[in-house]
Amino acid sequence: NNILSTSGGVAITKGKFNRFTVQVIEGNQGPYRLPGAEGELFVIVLAGTERVYLDGVILSRGYDRDYIIDYNSGEVTFMPSRIITKDSRIVVEYEYSNQQYLRSFYNLNVNYNTKKWNFNFNSYSEQDGKNSARGRDLTAEDKLALGASGDSINNTLVNSIREIEPSNKSIVVSYSLIDTTVNGKLFSILKFPWQEGSTRYIADFTDVGARNGYYNRVNEGVNGRVYRFVGEDAAGRPLGQYNPLSKLTAPNRKQMFTFGTTWKVDSNTIVTAEGALSGLDNNRFSAKDDADNQGIGLNINIVKNNMIFRKKGNWKGDVGVMYERVDKDFNIINPYRNQEFTRDWNITNIVKETQHLGRAFLNQRFGKKLYLNYGVSGLFQDIYFQGIKQEASIGLTLKKTTITTNISYLNSQSPTERSQFSRPSATITQQLPKLGNMIISLSYQSEFNKRASVVADTLLASSFAFQILRLSIVNNFTKNIATEVYTQRRNDYQPFT
């Protein structure tokens, strides 16, 4: 029963992916603007591609639900059912329209299956074309500038003034190019509106900061942004904020090649291993800074399910170990770790360094009424981060009563701080069949995050703690109709207060 299967695909993609952590403002429901992956301030989000998370929970779109989104402006607004506070953690994943370059991708997948083994090979490549940017061809000067910039493309600005046909009626804002003298200096400047009979020009303007540019934005009562030359003062210092420059974005290429295998040792034991080679070329026009383009990743898992510890009482358990190594130059196509990963590990500064992540767990079931889960994990990045995290959960069901408890405890250290992060929680739920299947639940949730300076051995202002106590009553009138009444109290604690 050996089976070999292959699949592949080629396509032109509409957009690029980004994961963005929103910087929230206390009491501000929005709108919050979503930027591009390369720092673009204004993007068009592709409809239906967004996934919005609040405190690790995915939200639903709609006026009668959690949030709404304006795809054209790339702005998210939250509904009154989700009150935004300074402690809210909002992460948005989305794809946005990328009009810089024509973007294509291809993938190839090969699988070979036997009774006990599976081997797979996957390749993926996503790249920008080199021919067009912002709807116009790159000039020879543009390509030379990109070739010299390497990966430092954020500082590459080029002249954006270009000619267009006088008969082009689709463009409202256009200019004439004239010569003028300021302080004895000769300037060739753009003047609005375009004068018929002269060469017609358009330009993209970039904000270079107050008193750093020669143009300012003005209101001319037309459908479009108009800029006027304002020159410089007597000391030769510019008076404006904008210049006719455009920020060059280099075409990039992302690639991933993986080889993996799965071994079914027996009906309950599985061993999986996968290696990956990534490639990221941030500038296809330049060979400069290409030394860090390739990186390697490795993942190994061993899991044994349904181990019988005691036949009487049906005591069974699952055990497993996992190891993951990610090279410092390894670049993923899209984020594969959950949105709360950095918070779970109390990471404040992301360091580009080889990362080792390991985990071992035991999930024990004592019949149908009691379970106990325990896991220990370690995350290490050379001298930049070392963390050990322990997690445990217990669940007990007694007729109509259910009790669950969870706790996570992290000990971590970086070159600047030590931290201890504990998160205990518990819930008791009681069903009352004689009262129309009413359900009463009492829950407790807390977090204690203690951060201390390594140098001064003092508590840092980023430390925090909170406790939440919640009482809830749910009344199920029918299968489709239910009501919930709850009361909740939260206490927040900050250092030095």
Locate the predicted segments by residue:
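Surface-exposed, low-hydrophobicity segments enriched in Gly/Pro/acidic/Ser residues
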Residues: 1-497
